[in-house]
């Protein structure tokens, strides 16, 4: 999923 990749590249985005 895109969100998973976003969290991987941007930990801040995960939160």
From Swiss-Prot:
UniProt keyword annotation of Ligase present: no
Organism: Manduca sexta (Tobacco hawkmoth)
Transmembrane region(s): none
Protein name: Allatostatin
Residues the record lists as Pyrrolidone carboxylic acid modifications: 1
Cited function: Strongly inhibits juvenile hormone biosynthesis in vitro by the corpora allata from fifth-stadium larvae and adult females.
Entry's Gene Ontology cellular component terms: extracellular region
UniProt family annotation: Belongs to the allatostatin family.
One example of a Gene Ontology biological process annotation: neuropeptide signaling pathway
Keyword Secreted: yes
């Amino acid at each position: 999923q895109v969100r998973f990749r976003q969290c991987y590249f941007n930990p801040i985005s995960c939160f």
